[in-house]
């Protein structure tokens, strides 16, 4: 006796019906987690282009992106809610990695001042007399007595490009209280702290760069 065979067309129709039923069962659920929407923040409070009026220096400077650990070298907005626990603000992120934002703020500040006219970044490996290299140790908000405070800590080295010799080094730390625990207010405090640190670093770099230039004469 021959085995009973279903016509090919019937088998195809049954397969389509089964697939459709399966898709209908799955349509009410998601097999993959939905991406959480993020608010993307620029680092606020950029300086207005305003020259210092002081004489231009005769040396060039390259500003390198600060080195940082994996917690800080990303676009998450870091927060220490208590103790040594580090987290990030849910549903919010920076427009770029923290070290890039800080380097660009330094460049903006130096360019607006105008005294270091021969200025470049490590994005373009142009020749420069001195290089500003650094390690970003903190770029986060920390809660103090229930209120957020932004902390930026940067270990800086001024290096002779030709000899790779460190000619000056210093730690900079700025703290800026946020006006509230709202993410937008914490972000505003990041901008204020970054501006303050950039101003301090500009003054120090000019002093150390001029001292180094005199020593080379």
Report each predicted region and the residues it spans.
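C-terminal motif of bacterial Sec signal peptides marking the signal peptidase cleavage site
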Residues: 25-28
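Surface-exposed short loop/turn segments
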Residues: 32-50, 57, 108, 113-163, ...
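Generic short beta-strand segments
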Residues: 66, 135-139, 173
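A structural "domain/chain start" motif
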Residues: 30-99, 208-217
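Short secondary-structure boundary motifs at beta->alpha junctions and helix caps
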Residues: 85-93, 162-203
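Bacterial N-terminal signal peptides that target proteins for export
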Residues: 2-18
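Surface-exposed helix-capping loop/turn segments at secondary-structure junctions
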Residues: 112-119, 203-217
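Extracytoplasmic/secreted envelope proteins and their assembly/folding machinery
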Residues: 99, 103-107, 113, 194, ...
């Amino acid at each position: 006796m021959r085995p009973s065979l279903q016509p090919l067309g019937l088998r195809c129709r049954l397969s389509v019906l089964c697939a459709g039923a399966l898709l209908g069962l799955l349509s009410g659920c998601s097999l993959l987690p939905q991406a959480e929407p993020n608010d993307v923040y620029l680092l606020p409070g950029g300086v207005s282009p305003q020259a210092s009026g002081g004489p231009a220096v005769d040396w060039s400077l390259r500003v390198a992106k600060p080195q940082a650990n994996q917690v800080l070298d990303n676009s998450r907005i870091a927060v220490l809610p208590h103790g040594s626990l580090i987290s990030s603000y849910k549903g919010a992120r920076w427009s770029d990695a923290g070290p890039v934002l800080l380097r660009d703020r330094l460049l903006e500040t130096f360019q607006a001042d105008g005294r270091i006219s021969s200025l470049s970044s490590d994005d373009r490996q142009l020749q420069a007399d001195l290089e500003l290299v650094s390690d970003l140790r903190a770029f986060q908000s920390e809660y103090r007595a229930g209120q957020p405070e932004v902390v930026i800590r940067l270990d800086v080295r001024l290096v002779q490009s030709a000899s790779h010799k460190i000619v000056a080094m210093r730690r900079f730390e700025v703290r800026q209280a946020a006006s509230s625990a709202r993410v937008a207010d914490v972000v505003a405090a990041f901008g204020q702290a970054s501006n303050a640190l950039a101003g301090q670093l500009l003054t120090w770099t000019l002093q150390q760069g001029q001292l180094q230039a005199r020593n080379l004469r």
